[in-house]
Regions:
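A short acidic, often aromatic-flanked loop/helix-cap motif at beta-alpha or helix-coil junctions
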Residues: 22-23, 86-91, 291-293
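Short strand->helix junction
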Residues: 32-33, 199, 266
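H-loop/switch region of ABC-family ATPase nucleotide-binding domains
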Residues: 263
Length: 340
């Protein structure tokens, strides 16, 4: 199995051990700690090990001028940039290769829940949305824009439907779900740019993209290839208990799907969300915020917590503490390591 290089120790790659519960990674650290530069190095290395890389960029973190300068040339030579608002992306909302004979009601319910959950819709609004999705499913043909079709159906449901349309109008006003839009390229870092959308729309479209990846994983991956989904500034995405991120963390490894989630601080999340994020088998802790320091120190589970607190406080830019089941050369390491 091709492994992801987390960093180098004395010239030897430090990777995630096959004994780890999954190959997902949680990265935390304050702004300026070097976590995004490190993340981009991991992405470029993963391309060399034949991973399919899909980046969901909600904050311009992967704009050309923000790629780590020492690797920028190689990085740009190996990436495909997709502007969702300008080019659209083929989401295949109404198809699922994992179950071609899937009952229409299942597909309709999945699409409805993806939009409703990430939009915090109530029961009445969800019921109305389901009617619009069902009608769109019935009338959909290849080449049509699935989201615009759903929006048109909402308008036809009367004043309440129009109100819901107005609430979600931006997702119906672009080619985000255009059949025949951009698709992912194997062998490249696929950067999906959501930065033109407002935060609420980002959550909805990103959730639909993740669902599409999940539903069509077999055609995306070949042989033992794995897909690595990059979620920088992951606090911008929908992280509820029924979210696709939660599902990938729970079940993704057996299908070759893993996520790398990066955020400045865990303290902004609720306890259930933190527990969900910490299902990632490997953590990379860059210089933490003061609000995270005590939590991370305790999570390292070492006898001398005072030393780890000091180590975390004095991490230099680009340095991190890796925690998980790691592999260095032929050795399996079950204790935290400092990666330069």
């Amino acid at each position: 199995m091709n492994k992801i290089t987390l960093g180098m120790l004395g010239g030897t790659p430090c990777t995630i051990s096959d004994a780890a519960p999954n190959h997902s990674i949680l990265i935390t650290g304050i702004s300026g700690s070097g976590k995004t530069c490190h993340l981009q190095r991991i992405e470029l290395d993963a391309i060399q090990t034949k991973h399919l890389i899909i980046v969901l960029d909600t904050s311009h973190s992967h704009d050309v001028d923000r790629i780590y300068n020492p690797i920028r040339s190689d990085y740009e030579a190996n990436c495909k940039r997709i502007s969702v608002s300008q080019e659209g992306i083929d989401l295949r909302l109404f198809s699922s290769e994992s179950s071609p004979s899937q009952q229409p009601n299942r597909i309709i319910n999945d699409v409805t829940q993806m939009i409703a959950s990430s939009s915090n819709l109530g029961k009445r609004q969800t019921k109305m949305l389901r009617k619009a999705v069902a009608s769109a499913y019935t009338n959909y043909t290849p080449g049509k824009n699935a989201l615009q079709l759903i929006g048109s159906n909402l308008i036809n449901l009367g004043s309440d439907g129009e109100d819901l349309y107005d609430r979600l109008w931006y997702i119906f006003q672009n080619d985000a779900a255009l059949s025949g839009g951009s698709t992912f390229e194997k062998g490249n870092i696929n950067i999906i740019d959501f930065s033109d959308f407002d935060p609420d729309t980002q959550k909805i479209i990103a959730e639909l993209v993740l669902k599409s990846i999940w539903n069509n994983k077999s055609s995306l991956l070949s042989g033992n290839q794995e897909c690595l989904i990059i979620l920088d500034e992951c606090q911008r995405l929908y992280l509820g208990p029924n979210s696709m991120i939660c599902q990938i963390l729970r079940e993704g490894r057996k299908f070759g799907l893993n996520v790398i989630m990066a955020t400045q601080s865990l303290s902004i999340f609720s306890k259930p969300t933190i527990s969900m994020l910490e299902q990632a088998g490997t953590k990379l802790y860059f210089q933490p915020s003061q609000s995270d320091l005590q939590r991370i120190t305790k999570s390292l589970q070492q006898a001398n917590q005072a030393n780890w607190k000091q180590t975390l406080t004095h991490l230099r830019r680009g340095e991190c503490v890796a925690d998980g089941i790691l592999q260095v050369g032929k050795s399996t390491i079950r204790r935290p390591l400092i990666l330069p």
